[in-house]
A protein has these predicted regions:
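Conserved glycine-rich cofactor-binding loop
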Residues: 15-16
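Alpha-helical segment proximal to the catalytic Tyr-Lys
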Residues: 128, 172-173
Length: 254
């Protein structure tokens, strides 16, 4: 993926799962990566691993529900690497899984703060920089839950529906500029989130056999592809990694 070489990617939720895999993939393709997450020790370790392999990486603690934290991430990208070319809005939570009538109002609100405000704050901080630079790609991690409600996931369903709308709005506002916004619905991925889902025992997703979950490398590679010119036709859209045609275009299957 030559389009990633020497470019700079900001990745939120980069301490584990899809975020960590994306940081490693982008770095392996020659990109500078800025890892952001609440757990500093984990992202520092990944950044050190990348640097040890000859890559360029920086890490910074960030709570995406706080705009000042997100702005600080962009400032680090500016100072360390000269700007931001790609923003991967990956940070998100699925806790607390609960039926509406027994849900915790504070936990529900916190999930919205992270899953929705976090995406908005990332866009708010990155778009002025991308517009000034004349290019840039934002990939927002979406979900089939945006359009297909699942029991016990009212907070997650609502937040991912909001992310889908924000993705489309951002792309409309980018207009005919080289910049674009796109969503990726990865499907079920072998991450810690699936452990929480299975433990809940609520809705059909919790009953899935772990063998059906795709590895984190798949969405990481799909995100890399979405940042390139071959995926420009999907701007403003929500791309599903369940689609075999998409998997072929990414190079995941023959």
């Amino acid at each position: 993926m030559s389009h990633l070489k020497s470019k700079t990617a900001v990745i939120t939720g980069a301490s584990r799962g899809i975020g960590a895999a994306t940081a490693r993939h982008f770095a392996a393709e020659g990109a500078n990566v800025v890892l952001a997450a609440r757990t500093t020790a984990e992202i520092e370790a990944i950044a050190e691993e990348i640097r040890g392999a000859g890559g360029a990486a920086a890490a910074i603690a960030c709570d995406v529900s706080r705009y000042e934290d997100v702005e600080a991430v962009m400032v680090l990208a500016d100072t360390a690497f000269g700007g931001v070319d790609f923003l991967i809005n990956n940070a998100g939570v699925i806790d607390p899984i609960s039926h509406l009538e027994t849900s915790d109002p504070d936990g529900w609100a916190q999930a919205i703060d992270i899953n929705v405000k976090g995406v908005y704050y990332g866009l708010r901080a990155a778009l002025p920089r991308m517009k000034a630079a004349g290019a840039g790609v934002v990939v927002n991690i979406s979900s089939g839950a945006a359009t297909s409600a699942l029991e016990g996931w009212s907070h997650y369903n609502a937040s991912k529906a909001a992310v889908l709308s924000i993705t489309r709005t951002a792309d409309k506002e980018l207009g005919d500029s080289p910049g674009r916004s796109v969503g990726l619905s990865p499907g079920t991925v072998a991450t810690e989130m699936q452990v929480l889902i299975k433990a809940s025992g609520i809705n059909p997703v919790s009953q899935l056999d772990p063998s059906v979950h795709i590895p984190t490398d798949w969405p990481a590679r799909a995100i890399g592809w979405l940042c390139g010119p071959d995926a420009a036709e999907y701007r403003g859209d929500d791309v599903s990694l369940r689609d075999e045609d998409i998997r072929r275009r990414v190079g995941l299957i023959d």
